[in-house]
C-alpha cells in the first residue's frame, strides 16, 4: 500500500512539473515583483529583505497580486535530471533517458559566465542578511545541487556532457569560492565568490562536488581539497551530532533539510573517497536526524524542536536522508 502511494505521488508530481514546463514559484522569489524595480524599492536592502520574508511567510499566495510570474530555476532542472536518471535506472524506459539529456543541454545555457568552471545561481534576486544577491549569480549551493544530478547522469546514463559539466563545476569550486582556513589547514568554502559566509551545508556541497569530480577523473587535488573542507565541518559538529546553520550569530538554528544536506554530502564523500574516518560523525548525525526530525506519526519536522511549517523540501529531504 505504501509503495503504491509513493508511486502515485511520484507520477502525479512528475506530470505536474512537465505540464508546467518545470516553472514554479520559490519561497524567496518575492523580489521578482515589478514593484521592486521602482527607485525607492530597488536599493533599500532592509525593506526588500522584509518584503521578501512577507511573501515567503504569507498564508495566502501574494505572487499573482504582486505580478510575480512562475520562474524556471536551474536548480529545478538539476533535480529533474537526477529524477529522470533514477527513473531510467529503475525501469530502463528510454523516454526518461532522453528527457534527462534534454535538460542537461538546457542547463548548459543557464551556466553563469566569467568563472573558472560551470556554475549556476537562482533565477531570482534575493536578499540575505549580509548581501543582495542578483538573479543567476552563482552559489555553491545551486551549483552543488545541480552537479549532483549531473553526476548521477554521468555515472548511470554514461552522459559525456554531464561528466564534463561536473568536472568543470569542480574548477569553479576550487578557484572561484573564497575560503576561511584554520591553522590545521581545514577550511570552509564561501557561499558564493562574492562573500565570506561560513554556512555548513553550503561548504559540504562544494566538498561533495569535488569528491564526485575525483571519482570521474582521479585528480588528487579534488579529493585532498574535499577532505580538508570536510574536516572543518566535522570539527563543528556538537556532541549530540548537530550542526547549526552557519557561524553567523543569526544562523544558530537547526533544521531538517540543511542537516540532511550535510549528511548526504558526507555519505557521498565517504563512498567516493574510501575515507571512513568520518563514519562515526555520519552515524552520530544520522541518529540525531532520525530521532529529532521525524515525528512519531512519520511526519517530517521542519526544526529539531518544531514540526511546522510543513515544508516540501523537508519532506523530500527526509526521504533521501
Task: Give residue spans per PLM region.
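Glycan-recognition and catalytic cores of secretory/periplasmic carbohydrate-active enzymes
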Residues: 1-321
